[in-house]
């Protein structure tokens, strides 16, 4: 049923029937307004969905266009050519169709959304404003009328006439507003019949245009579609015809694979595992290797089927000799060593089986090993801190600083391994070692030169900053105060051997110059620390703890670079006197078990400035808390008489010679509390060994002996032993760590502090 008409004549009467008819028109306008809002929302969602659909179809078309068919064989048939180009044809059709869709989408917003928004805001919005005005005037008129009717008839005539005039004016204004509102309501009701429907028609017309364009594209594509269908059918028929022949050949290969092997240009080829040296120990990398006997050329391609690709650059070397690896010299089976003409050192390879090793050995004319106990030692340490070593580093540094210091990623980007090895073989050759820098390095890439420098440092028998100082360097980097870190590292650097310190000085000066150009080469001090930390401070064992300390290795290198002038050009400051250190320590009644790693092992003190001095700051800081315990206080009280007359010179540390690490003062004396062994007492009654007895004889003269622990010790590393006072160790002999012995306790072999034990 339609809406009733609103008569202007009824505006004056303002009857209930008129109000009811007006309310039905208002409800219809509100319904229309909500519908248009929902329609606009759905229209925007539709346009967004069409855009997403178009984007997805374009991406699909791009994927089709990028793929290229590669058929088996050197040439392609006409059918294969037709099939190969079909994806590009599909992509062209889809793109053409999406171009038309985008035109439709771009017009949809102007054709559909904008007109509907305009009609809703301008027309229906105007009707709502008119309604607010009409309701306001209605309330005003009714209020004035009620007030007027409540006037007393006893008022003056003039007042009554004035009130009548005012009511007439309000009534007239209300009547005008009512007429305007009725006119606007009926106008909007009529306008919606065309202004609302016309945009929808325009949108559908655009949609039909898009579909018609698709129809035209389909007609144009029909010829290629027919051709492609025929090509696909022909290809399927050929496949069915050749499949039986391929299956027959496969069965023959399964039954007798050796008769159907391809003729190879190589004397021998197959997979081998090649031992590679890393920052932490060694690793075995799978390579596909080939060998030609005529040219003696070995090619190694790192490849692992599990990872599905190459793991690095190819490498080719010229064979010099091949030797079977002695079984007891390596944990792996089926190993043999290869020496190359153009690469220093020995390449250790592992075959897949004993038969496979025999075939490789035969192909390379391999020989059995010579059982010489000194052979392994002679092959190690090809890189040394000698004149050639310094020459190599200086040449590399000169080349980098003169023509590559601004190259981005300097020292971080690595060179090709084969090129690096070839450059090193040239630099390490005594014949070319004396040549000038430019003659050696001018033709090589900067990344090859920087990789050669790092590789040479890793080839040294031990790290440049030495195994025995690694723990001290790491502890220094862990100090909270920056000045303490610099001071401690300063002292440790001057305890390095002269050649190590000179090489480190040379390297740090160079890295400081590299860091000064970090805006060009992007290698900040922090980046250089990441690169050189594992090289200069590589650990002796690959452990989780060593990996966790890498970040502190980097900090050590950063401090060396930032403070290289102070560290290498000045002598470390003299540590505070021992009497001052004793007075500055707070006494504690708690005594915790001493730790092997935190306790001083040997302490050197000399007046000659050119000799090395142990860093006493870190030693006393780490051990004095356990010194001033209740047990130690008892010991100090028993010697209070002689201590009362001491001056500062009386508190000098006693000299402990390196070949007598477990020696202690013969009798308790004023100097003994600061001797290296005094903090290790586990009880006041612990016996003090005398320096004149046979127990003081050097352990070096008797390699395997028994020893007894003088003090308790708690290990902080897997390589150390924990023990209590009085424990007896077997097979005690010197270790590679200065200040430590190796011994066996309860079947476990580990490190023991030298000055914790006496030999039996």
From Swiss-Prot:
- Annotated Low complexity bias: 674-701
- The PH domain extends over 265-369
| GO CC entries | cytoskeleton; cytosol; endosome membrane; focal adhesion; mitochondrion
What are the protein's UniProt keywords?
Answer: Cell junction, Cytoplasm, Cytoskeleton, Endosome, GTPase activation, Membrane, SH3 domain
- Output the SMART domains linked to this UniProt entry: PH (SM00233), RhoGAP (SM00324), SH3 (SM00326)
User: One MF term from GO for this chain?
Assistant: GTPase activator activity
Summary of the function given for this chain in its UniProt record: GTPase-activating protein for RHOA and CDC42. May be involved in the regulation of neosynthesized protein export through a Rab-endososomal dependent export route.
What is the protein name for this chain?
Rho GTPase-activating protein 26
The organism is Gallus gallus
Q: Which gene encodes it?
A: ARHGAP26
């Amino acid at each position: 049923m339609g809406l009733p008409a609103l008569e202007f004549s009824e505006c004056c009467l303002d009857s209930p029937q008129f109000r009811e008819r007006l309310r039905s028109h208002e409800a219809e306008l509100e319904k229309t307004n909500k519908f248009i809002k929902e329609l606009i929302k759905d229209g925007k969602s539709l346009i967004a969905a069409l855009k997403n659909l178009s984007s997805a179809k374009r991406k699909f078309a791009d994927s089709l266009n990028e793929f290229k068919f590669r058929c088996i064989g050197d040439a392609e048939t006409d059918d294969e050519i037709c099939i190969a180009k079909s994806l590009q044809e599909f992509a062209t059709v889809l793109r053409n169709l999406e171009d038309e869709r985008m035109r439709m989408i771009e017009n949809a917003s102007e054709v559909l959304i904008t007109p509907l928004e305009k009609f809703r805001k301008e027309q229906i919005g105007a009707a709502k404003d008119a309604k607010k005005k009409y309701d306001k005037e209605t309330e005003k008129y009714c209020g004035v009328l009620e007030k007027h009717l409540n006037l007393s008839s006893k008022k003056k005539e003039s007042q009554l006439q004035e009130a009548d005039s005012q009511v007439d004016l309000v009534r007239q204004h209300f009547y005008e507003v009512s007429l305007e509102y009725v006119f606007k309501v009926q106008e909007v009701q009529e306008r919606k019949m065309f202004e609302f429907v016309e945009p929808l028609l325009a949108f559908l017309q655009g949609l039909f245009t898009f579909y018609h364009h698709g129809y035209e594209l389909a007609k144009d594509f029909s010829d290629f579609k027919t051709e492609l269908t025929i090509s696909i059918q022909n290809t399927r028929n050929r496949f069915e015809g050749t499949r039986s022949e391929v299956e027959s050949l496969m069965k023959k290969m399964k039954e007798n694979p050796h008769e159907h092997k391809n003729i190879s240009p190589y004397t021998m080829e197959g997979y081998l595992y090649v031992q590679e040296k890393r920052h932490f120990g060694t690793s075995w990398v799978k390579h596909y290797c080939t060998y030609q006997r005529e040219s003696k050329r070995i090619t190694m391609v790192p490849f692992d089927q599990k990872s599905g690709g190459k793991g690095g650059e190819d490498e080719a070397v010229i064979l010099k000799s091949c030797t079977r690896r002695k079984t007891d010299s390596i944990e792996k089976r089926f190993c043999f060593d290869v020496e190359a003409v153009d690469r220093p050192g020995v390449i250790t390879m592992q075959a897949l089986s004993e038969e496979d090793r025999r075939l490789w050995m035969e192909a390379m004319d391999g020989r059995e090993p010579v059982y010489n106990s000194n052979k392994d030692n002679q092959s190690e340490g090809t890189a040394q801190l000698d004149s050639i070593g310094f020459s190599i580093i200086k040449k590399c540094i000169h080349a980098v600083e003169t023509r590559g210091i601004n190259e981005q990623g300097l020292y971080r980007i690595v060179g090709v391994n084969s090129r690096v090895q070839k450059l090193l073989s040239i630099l390490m050759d005594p014949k070319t070692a004396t040549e000038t820098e430019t003659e050696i390095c001018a033709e090589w890439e900067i990344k090859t030169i920087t990789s050669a420098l790092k590789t040479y440092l890793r080839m040294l028998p031990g790290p440049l900053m030495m195994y025995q100082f690694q723990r001290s360097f790491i502890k220094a980097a862990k100090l909270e105060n920056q000045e303490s870190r610099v001071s401690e590292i300063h002292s440790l650097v001057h305890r390095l051997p002269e050649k190590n310190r000179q090489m480190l000085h040379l390297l740090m000066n160079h890295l400081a110059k590299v860091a000064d150009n970090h805006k060009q080469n992007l290698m900040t001090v922090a980046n250089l620390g990441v690169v050189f930390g594992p090289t200069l401070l590589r650990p002796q064992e690959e452990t989780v703890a060593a990996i966790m300390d890498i970040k502190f290795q980097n900090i050590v290198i950063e401090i060396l670079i930032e403070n290289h002038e102070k560290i290498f050009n000045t002598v470390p400051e003299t540590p505070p006197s021992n009497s001052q250190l004793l007075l500055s320590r707070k006494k504690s009644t708690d005594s915790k078990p001493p730790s092997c790693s935190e306790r001083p092992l040997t302490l050197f003190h000399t007046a000659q400035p050119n000799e090395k001095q142990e860093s006493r700051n870190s030693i006393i800081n780490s051990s004095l808390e356990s010194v001033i315990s209740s047990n130690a206080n008892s010991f100090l009280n028993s010697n209070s008489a002689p201590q009362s007359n001491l001056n500062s010179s009386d508190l000098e540390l006693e000299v402990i010679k390196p070949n007598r690490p477990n020696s202690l003062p013969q009798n308790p004396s004023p100097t003994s509390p600061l001797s290296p062994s005094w903090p290790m007492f586990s009880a006041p009654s612990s016996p003090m060994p005398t320096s004149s007895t046979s127990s003081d004889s050097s352990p070096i003269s008797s390699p395997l002996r028994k020893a007894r622990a003088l003090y308790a010790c708690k290990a902080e590393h897997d390589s150390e032993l924990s023990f209590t006072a009085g424990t007896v160790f077997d097979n005690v002999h010197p270790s590679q760590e200065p200040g430590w012995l190796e011994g066996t306790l309860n079947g476990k072999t580990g490190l023991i502090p030298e000055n914790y034990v006496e030999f039996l």
